Amino acid sequence: MSQKTLFTKSALAVAVALISTQAWSAGFQLNEFSSSGLGRAYSGEGAIADDAGNVSRNPALITMFDRPTFSAGAVYIDPDVDITGHSDLTGQSANAKNIAPTAWVPNLHFVAPINDQFGWGASITSNYGLATEFTDNYAAGIYGGKTDLQTINLNLSGAYRLNNSWSFGLGFDAVYAKAKIERYAGSLGPLLSQQLIAQGVPASLTNGINTPDSQIAHLKGDEWGFGWNAGILYELDKDNRWGLTYRSEVKIDFDGDYKSSINPNLNNILGNMGLPYGTMGATQNGSLTLNLPEMWEISGYNRVAPQWAIHYSMAYTSWSQFQELKAKGDSGQTLFYKDEGFRDAYRIALGTTYYYDKNWTFRTGIAYDDSPVPADKRSISIPDQDRLWLSAGLTYAFNEDASIDVGASYMHGQKVKFTEGEGAAAYSFESEGKAWLFGTNFNYAF
């Protein structure tokens, strides 16, 4: 079994195809925008200015650079996520191993000063992404199936230094997203088919649900959304500074294609049971609005000794803006619905940096990701859990212009138990995940 995301469109095809991953932060948020940040568990990112990647987190940091600076790299994710489960009605197994694939998450950053007060920057990252994929005949296919979300964020930002202490930054985000949702009848399909036939429904009407691999829902689409980000930087002196950053909510209004193997004559019966809208394989227009939530973060950096610094962050994401997945047809009918019910969540991180000499810099970090998914809303389509990060990394400077960052993190998610569905459609699950992340970036100052 595997999990994956696939996003291709014109010039974005190569970059987006590389970003194929299960979300390795809370919910379906991605943090992997730099390798130096990976090595410190992304602690202090709104206040550290050791490479151009930090500017994507806090645009006010642009004023910390006195030369045009470039950074490019990728983070490799090697996850291990298993799900064990069974049907509460029949006891049939719903186990799935290694449901998350290995993946690369690339990043590209550039920052340039204009003068002593103004500067600008640009970046290409991915802030949100999710994929769950089970085999077509998976027993709990009505909940598993395929759920793919991929985003690529294009950011352009500028900054202004008011004085020696205060700097302000503002950025514009253009987010390209592509999503796909597929659901299958699973073990519930043949059971429902038998019950309907026993109640006098012609067998021919149940052909769209009578096998586990019957595709009862398929929705896909791609679209652009737009948002903004802002940051403030306060410098007490060259060794102590703090940052406050904000990234706005981005609404993606998908208009795509929908189809279902279910016979439309069964919509009244199966719709009342929560199953998707049937089209008997015919494709029709479908729309879905996805809210990518806003995020606040406060960060600090303190060089407490000539060779030592500490850095820390607390991020707050308004996940309550993501309450449902609801696809509608042209006539306003509900094609597919899933109650998500996320709640706001936080992330805290603490790290330290050791400046060994002019060539070598070493860093470590620890972080805790609070899951936004309430216990009664957990799902195998978004198998989220609280996570602990342990990170380490280094930078080697070849000279005053060129350097390379290497970072590694180990993440462990707590084991969670939950039930999805009711009655004959109820399944009990247990999920646990862990992952290794490795990243490298090349930096160059002109």
UniProtKB/Swiss-Prot annotation:
Superkingdom assignment: Bacteria
Signal peptide: 1-25
A Pfam family it matches: Toluene_X
Subcellular location(s) of the protein: Cell outer membrane
GO cellular component, one term: cell outer membrane
Gene3D superfamilies, A to Z: Outer membrane protein transport protein (OMPP1/FadL/TodX)
Main location: membrane
Similarity annotation: Belongs to the OmpP1/FadL family.
Function: Involved in translocation of long-chain fatty acids across the outer membrane. FadL may form a specific channel.
Name listed for the protein in its UniProt record: Long-chain fatty acid transport protein
Provenance organism: Escherichia coli O6:H1 (strain CFT073 / ATCC 700928 / UPEC)
Source lineage: Bacteria, Pseudomonadati, Pseudomonadota, Gammaproteobacteria, Enterobacterales
